[in-house]
């Protein structure tokens, strides 16, 4: 079996799937760039071997098992944490690598389900070029623009926002708080340093381990679970330093 993932390039991902099927893969672990397109393409391709799908999807003849985190719930929980801690008078900018990418729209709907009724003004900024996020933040230094809170709706957006803010104390004066979805070692360090105020994380080690386990079972014709849902957790600096989720956040250490 083989794990396939091409970041933000669904065409390349489809080519890889077809290539590996032709080469006789016994199972495929697929982390889709775009869930909707991936499901349609799998139906067209009819891979002939079981697919372990990292994301929520309907189980069919191709998809043996789906492993996912509830993105809507993740967005809703993040929205609750923001509403508990922040002033609704400060606008919220939601930054996204693209709403078409897997899970982003669900997370967006989840966070807005809380922030809108709580009286927050919410603006969506989708990445259109390499400097989309930086330009949006640069605008805050002009008096007529005003301050805002930033939320990275995916790990790519959150990582870039954190790096931009860490590199400029001026920007940090105008972006009142940074929240987001996703965790990397770099992001956890930035959370510890206070660049990121809070983020949603889930057990990536379990996700990877389970996907391989289910692929082996499916290749051998034996598996039971059709859908596995991972539980997201909210992490802030205090929770991080408490060590409660140390095994989840740093599984290899």
Where are these regions (language model features)?
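Hinge/cleft segment of the Venus flytrap/periplasmic-binding protein
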Residues: 114-118, 203-253
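Flexible loop/hinge segments that line or gate small-molecule binding clefts
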Residues: 34-73, 184-192
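Short beta-strand elements in bilobed, periplasmic/extracellular small-molecule ligand-binding domains
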Residues: 1-7, 91-94, 112-134, 147-149
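Structural motif
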Residues: 2-23, 125-144, 157-161
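Periplasmic-binding protein-like
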Residues: 24-32, 50-54, 92-96, 122-123, ...
């Amino acid at each position: 079996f083989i794990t396939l993932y091409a970041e933000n390039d669904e065409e390349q991902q489809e080519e890889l799937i077809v290539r590996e099927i032709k080469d006789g893969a016994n199972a495929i672990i697929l982390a889709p760039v775009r869930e909707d397109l991936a499901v349609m393409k799998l139906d067209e391709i009819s891979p002939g071997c079981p697919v372990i799908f990292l994301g929520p999807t309907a189980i069919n003849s191709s998809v043996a098992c789906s492993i996912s985190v509830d993105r809507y719930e993740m967005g809703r929980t993040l929205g609750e944490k923001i509403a508990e801690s922040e002033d609704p008078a400060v606008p919220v900018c939601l930054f996204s690598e693209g709403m078409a990418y897997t899970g982003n729209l669900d997370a967006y709907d989840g966070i807005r389900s809380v922030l809108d009724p709580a009286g927050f003004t919410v603006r969506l900024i989708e990445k259109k070029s390499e400097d989309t996020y930086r330009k949006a933040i640069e605008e805050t230094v002009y008096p007529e623009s005003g301050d805002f809170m930033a939320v990275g709706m995916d790990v790519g957006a959150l990582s870039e926002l954190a790096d931009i803010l860490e590199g400029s104390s001026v920007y940090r004066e105008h972006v009142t708080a940074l929240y987001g979805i996703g965790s990397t070692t770099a992001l956890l360090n930035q959370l510890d340093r206070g660049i990121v105020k809070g983020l949603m994380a889930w057990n990536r080690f379990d996700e990877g381990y389970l996907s391989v386990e289910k692929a082996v079972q499916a290749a051998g014709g034996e598996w039971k679970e059709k859908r596995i849902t991972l539980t997201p957790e909210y992490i802030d600096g205090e929770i991080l330093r408490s060590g409660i989720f140390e095994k989840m956040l740093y599984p290899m250490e």
